[in-house]
């Protein structure tokens, strides 16, 4: 029967069973609706009739058709039987890619990588848990059996970025010297870590070791430097009282000894023996301690006593070879060190359990106390000077051989040089001696902030400056002069040779990032100086005063970064060039100094320091208030790096006005670029101005700061939206897994450094990346910001009882004193002086820290 065309709304005539096929032809207005219905592969005449009798059904949307097709064709295959192989193959590929060798992706080139994805975080990762239960208190308060943390995973140190301001805030701050950013954009205020070195010279075990090594090294090191006067506990209390709620972690660096078996077995907590048996058996390839010859029949017996007979031979060997003994302050309760532990008195769980409704902010943000032994911080770099490629060779063997020469160490300078290797260290640190005390409330900004950088307290006497020469008669100096001279000699090989100011005897501000830079830049000298067990030894060129080196390194890296920003990143990129000073540069310099057509014969230019408002009264307070951060409370600021570089110190009687002007000799400073109008490499000009003729670089900085106006440093930077393409990967080079932050070469001398844009970006940008060079320079400068400041501080030598009384009366009578340094080199009345000191300490800081053994949960709590 021939088909009949359907034209609604008229009812179609009755049809035989086989006539319905014509109604589903493509020409039928019902075709799409019928064909799209689920499960209608053979519609019966009755269903077709009902469909045709019903109202008109609009065509289905494409998305519904897709869902229908997916449901019809894919759902039957989504079963455990089909999904399990897919999951197992995916897991296998992931394991191969992450643990054996990286697998290339066919889509890798379609996704453009971003540099931000390759930077490490500013936060140093927390250290691993030590073997055993490190939350337990020590069995004996004098010593602690512990399993050292492993060496940092290579390559180490990996340079991490400083905390940068957000891009829009960074631009405003560096270009204009102020910012519209508020608390939301700026983020939370920085918190600080604090570090102390401590040793108990009265400990017979430590004293016997020192005497033995003193005889081996044939030196005479006085024991009075190591006497314990109970200063540490009160130094820590003073910091807690001065900065409540603003401290992240306290770090104690402690001496340690090899594990003597079986004598030290009694220092191992019996409760951890079962776990140690399991761990020791696994390290020896055994599956269970019961398989060990001589192991106890029941693990339950292991917790009853710890004797040589109650542990397996494998565990005994494990303890002797891998465990060590830590010297500890007797007042320290190791079970109350970590506020994140629910059993800690200040943990929210413990607070709510005690029925307290409200917690004091100082307790809610109480710092963690971490300890590290000399063994755990004495390491050598396993990375090249760029901070990116791992050094090849027998690294572990080299480090172990070096440790044999360096440890045990009785030299505080050698130990201080390892502070940056502390596990879990923050970027901003206050480094204290145990005889440093904070007497007044302080803000974080009294020490460090992302806006102004680290606060340095220099001494400003001309004759107190440190000479740049290594003197043979100071190589074995028991004081610090030899270490200072050596440190300045290292700086003078890398930067201009000059006198550099000494710093006040107060807590020092260190940034972990700068410590790691110094560890790479001067790694040979620091590795050798760290093997000097005593200051009196005649090894190498002497000790290195690391804290002073880091302080002065910050000043020099800032100056270097300023000049690189102008000479290479700004002048070197004019007119589309990436590496040359040319006619465009000459025109820019003439415009900077206001040359006219008649000034071609000008050879010398007198530069005057312009007016600056960076440190005008009230400005800093407004900036911190706008950011939602606390303004400084106990510091007077003398100079900000946002105003260029510190003026040189003058001799007594010299006119201070001479630091407000300078002369630029164009022929001398710019050489053939100016005299013969030859094009030169921008990196060569950078070396000329920065190192060969440092007075030229200093005067150019003054000129550019003046040209920037009253605030900001805009004259240094390249124009906005200046982009430079980073070099592509060279033959055989591997794609970087992580990127170091913007930084300049870490070579030990300036002669061998390559300051070209291509070289700098080859290690601090992704291959082929389009780098916003203006933002890059601002991030570079952020690493080295600093303030020169002074606080009302006292430093006293406790010689006798009468002298001690006078000192304490004077301090108590002057509430302006904010920092106290107290040297206990007692010459007479030793017991009386010690009693006076402890009496004054307890009067000044009666509230005990929560980790002290006799901490009282009522008397020692914080109150509003």
Curated annotation (Swiss-Prot):
Give the membrane topology, semicolon-separated if more than one.
Single-pass type I membrane protein
Q: Which residues lie on this side of the membrane: Cytoplasmic?
A: 1-82
Region (Disordered) residue ranges read 1-66
Cite the entry's keywords alphabetically: Carbohydrate metabolism, Glycoprotein, Glycosyltransferase, Golgi apparatus, Manganese, Membrane, Transferase, Transmembrane, Transmembrane helix, Xylose metabolism
Domain of life of the source: Eukaryota
Could you say which cofactors this protein requires? Mn(2+)
A Pfam family of the record is Stealth_CR4
Reaction(s) this enzyme catalyzes, per UniProt: 3-alpha-D-mannopyranosyl-alpha-D-mannopyranose + UDP-alpha-D-xylose = 3-O-(6-O-alpha-D-xylosylphospho-alpha-D-mannopyranosyl)-alpha-D-mannopyranose + UMP + H(+)
Which EC numbers does the record give? 2.7.8.32
Say if the entry is tagged with keyword S-adenosyl-L-methionine.
no
Which one GO biological process term can you cite for this protein?
carbohydrate phosphorylation
Q: Which GO terms describe its molecular function?
A: glycosyltransferase activity; UDP-N-acetylglucosamine-lysosomal-enzyme N-acetylglucosaminephosphotransferase activity
Q: Which residue intervals are annotated with compositional bias (Low complexity) in the record?
A: 16-29, 42-52
What is its subcellular localisation?
Golgi apparatus membrane
TM stretches of this protein:
83-103
Topological domains annotated Lumenal:
104-864
Annotated glycosylation sites: 200, 301, 583
Name the protein family. Answer: Belongs to the XPT1 family.
- The protein's name: 3-O-alpha-D-mannopyranosyl-alpha-D-mannopyranose xylosylphosphotransferase
Organism, as annotated: Cryptococcus neoformans var. grubii (Filobasidiella neoformans var. grubii)
């Amino acid at each position: 029967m021939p088909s009949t065309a359907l034209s609604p709304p008229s009812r179609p005539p009755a049809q035989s069973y086989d006539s319905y096929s014509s109604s589903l032809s493509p020409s039928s207005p019902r075709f799409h609706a019928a064909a799209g219905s689920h499960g209608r592969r053979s519609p019966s005449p009755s269903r077709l009739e009902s469909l045709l009798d019903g109202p008109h059904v609009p065509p289905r949307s494409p998305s519904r058709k897709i869902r229908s097709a997916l449901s019809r064709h894919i759902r039957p295959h989504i079963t455990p039987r089909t999904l399990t192989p897919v999951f197992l193959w995916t897991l296998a590929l992931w394991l191969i890619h992450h643990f054996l060798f990286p697998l290339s992706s066919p889509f890798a080139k379609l996704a453009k990588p971003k540099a931000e994805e390759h930077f490490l975080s500013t936060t140093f990762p927390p250290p691993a848990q030590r073997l055993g239960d490190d939350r337990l208190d020590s069995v004996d308060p004098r010593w602690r059996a512990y399993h050292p943390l492993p060496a940092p995973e290579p390559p180490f140190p990996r340079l991490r970025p400083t905390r940068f301001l957000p891009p829009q805030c960074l631009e405003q701050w560096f270009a204009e010297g102020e910012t519209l950013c508020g608390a939301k954009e700026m983020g939370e205020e920085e918190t600080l870590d604090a570090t102390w070195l401590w040793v108990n010279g009265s400990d017979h075990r430590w004293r016997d070791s020192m005497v033995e090594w003193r005889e081996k090294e044939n030196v005479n090191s006085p024991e009075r430097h190591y006497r314990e006067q109970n200063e540490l506990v009160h130094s820590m209390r003073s910091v807690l009282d001065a900065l409540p709620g603003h401290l992240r972690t306290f770090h104690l660096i402690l001496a340690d000894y090899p594990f003597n078996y079986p004598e030290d077995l009694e220092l191992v907590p019996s409760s951890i023996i079962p776990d140690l048996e399991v761990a020791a058996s696994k390290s020896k390839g055994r599956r269970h301690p019961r398989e060990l010859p001589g192991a106890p029949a029941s693990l339950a017996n292991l917790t009853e006593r710890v004797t040589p007979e109650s542990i397996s031979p494998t565990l005994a060997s494990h303890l002797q070879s891998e465990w060590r003994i830590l010297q500890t302050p007797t007042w320290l309760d190791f079970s109350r060190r970590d506020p994140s532990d629910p059993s800690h008195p200040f943990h929210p769980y413990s607070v709510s359990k005690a029925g307290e409704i409200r917690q004091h902010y100082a307790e809610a943000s109480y710092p963690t106390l971490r300890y590290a032994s000399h063994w755990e911080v004495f390491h050598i770099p396993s990375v090249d000077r760029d901070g990116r490629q791992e050094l090849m060779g027998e690294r572990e063997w080299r480090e172990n051989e070096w440790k044999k020469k360096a440890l045990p160490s009785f030299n505080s300078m050698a130990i201080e040089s390892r502070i940056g290797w502390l596990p879990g260290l923050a970027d901003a640190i206050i480094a204290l001696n145990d005889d440093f005390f904070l007497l007044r409330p302080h803000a974080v900004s009294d020490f460090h902030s992302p806006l102004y950088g680290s606060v340095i307290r220099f001494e400003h006497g001309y004759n107190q400056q440190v000479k740049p020469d290594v003197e043979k008669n100071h190589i074995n100096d028991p004081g610090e002069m030899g270490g200072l001279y050596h440190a300045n000699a290292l700086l003078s090989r890398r930067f201009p040779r000059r006198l550099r100011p000494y710093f006040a005897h107060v807590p020092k501000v260190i940034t972990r990032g700068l410590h790691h830079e110094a560890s790479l830049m001067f790694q040979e000298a620091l590795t050798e100086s760290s093997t000097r067990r005593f200051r009196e030894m005649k090894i190498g060129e002497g000790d290195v005063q690391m804290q002073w080196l880091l302080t002065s390194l910050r000043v020099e890296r800032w100056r270097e970064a300023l000049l690189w920003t102008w000479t290479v990143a700004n002048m070197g990129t004019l007119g589309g060039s990436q590496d040359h000073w040319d006619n465009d540069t000459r025109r820019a310099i003439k415009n900077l100094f206001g040359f006219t057509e008649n000034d071609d014969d000008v050879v010398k230019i007198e530069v005057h320091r312009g007016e600056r408002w960076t440190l005008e009264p009230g400005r800093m307070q407004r900036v911190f208030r706008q950011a939602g951060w606390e303004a400084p409370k106990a510091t007077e600021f003398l100079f900000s790096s946002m105003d260029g570089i510190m003026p040189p110190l003058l001799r007594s009687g010299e006119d201070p006005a001479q630091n407000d002007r300078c002369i630029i000799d164009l022929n001398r400073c710019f050489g053939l670029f100016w005299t013969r109008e030859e094009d030169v490499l921008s990196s060569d000009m950078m070396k000329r101005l920065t190192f060969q003729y440092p007075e030229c670089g200093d005067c150019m900085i003054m000129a550019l700061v003046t040209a920037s106006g009253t605030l900001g440093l805009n004259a240094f930077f390249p124009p906005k939206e200046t982009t430079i393409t980073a070099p592509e990967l060279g033959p055989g080079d591997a794609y970087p897994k992580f990127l170091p932050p913007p930084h300049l070469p870490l070579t030990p001398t300036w002669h061998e450094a390559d300051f070209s844009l291509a070289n700098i970006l080859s290690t601090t940008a992704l291959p082929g990346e389009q780098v916003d060079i203006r933002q890059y320079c601002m991030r570079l400068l952020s690493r080295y910001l600093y303030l020169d400041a002074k606080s009302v501080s006292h430093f006293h030598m406790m010689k006798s009882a009468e002298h001690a009384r006078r000192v304490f009366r004077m301090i108590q009578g002057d509430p302006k004193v904010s920092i106290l340094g107290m040297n206990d080199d007692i010459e007479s009345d030793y017991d009386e002086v010690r009693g006076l000191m402890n009496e004054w300490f307890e009067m000044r800081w009666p509230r005990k820290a929560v980790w002290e053994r006799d901490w009282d949960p009522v008397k020692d709590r914080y109150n509003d």
